[in-house]
């Protein structure tokens, strides 16, 4: 794992892969922002970087990632079902189940993946990194 207070930006694929495994996209720390499956901390437990970064609507990006993953999964299921000759009723039951359950299960992952995309688009400022270091020094991730 990288040093928690690193200032160089990881590559986008690395940040996305870290996000898929609920790790901090910046430092790779386990658990990142989560104290439970859905309960979030204000900062990464390892590097201290804040997930909010003074922007309104950050949650919208995570929700959008969830929509893309859910729709992609449903479309893949439907294509597979049509090619395999699955009857219409089972096809729709599974697709409906995926539409309801998939976003709920994947929310923490889509959240950390979106955080990685956001970090790639808008690199943390020196002020963000200084606040992260101060939060770690104060013992309040």
Please describe what each predicted stretch is.
Residues 91-141:
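Cytosol/matrix-facing juxtamembrane amphipathic
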Residues 24-28, 44-47:
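Short cysteine-rich clusters marking metal-coordination/redox-active sites
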Residues 42-49, 115, 119:
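Short amphipathic alpha-helical coupling elements at transmembrane boundaries
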Residues 1-10:
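Short, Lys/Arg-rich, polar N-terminal cytosolic tail immediately upstream
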Residues 58-71:
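Select subsegments of transmembrane alpha-helices in polytopic membrane proteins
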Residues 69-92:
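Juxtamembrane "helix exit" motif at the C-terminal ends of alpha-helical transmembrane segments
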Residues 31, 51:
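Cys/His-rich microdomains that often coordinate metals
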